[in-house]
Regions:
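Enriched for short, Lys/Arg-rich terminal
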Residues: 68, 72-97
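Short Gly/Pro-enriched turn/cap motifs at secondary-structure boundaries
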Residues: 59-61
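Basic, Lys/Arg-enriched alpha-helical interface segments
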Residues: 1-57, 74-77, 96-97
Length: 97
């Protein structure tokens, strides 16, 4: 089983996006978080399945929202680098360790 480690800024991105969606429509923030959890489960089931996008980083898009989880795998750790809004500039997260 992989240990999930999230970059602090990725956690902030997740929380900010959930708040933003919730402000737009009550309950939408919870649906966003559900979609995040579903995406994370898919990654954990097959972490090496998804596309490389930069160096050792991989990306998997959410099903229902225009977002993606950017992550890398090292030994028994899955590092979440970003919870990226796909409408935002690409690779803003590239310097995160």
């Amino acid at each position: 089983m992989l240990h999930v480690v999230s970059h602090p800024e990725a956690g902030e991105e997740l929380e900010a996006a959930a708040r933003w969606y919730e402000e737009r429509q009550p309950g939408l923030g919870a649906r966003f978080l559900d979609d995040f959890e579903k995406t994370l489960r898919r990654i954990l089931e097959a972490p090496n399945r998804w596309h490389f996008i930069r160096d050792t980083n991989r990306k998997l898009n959410f099903d229902r929202f225009p977002c993606a989880i950017i992550y890398s795998v090292d030994n028994d750790h899955l590092y979440i680098k970003a919870v990226m809004d796909l409408r935002r500039r690409p690779f803003y997260w590239k310097d995160r360790r």
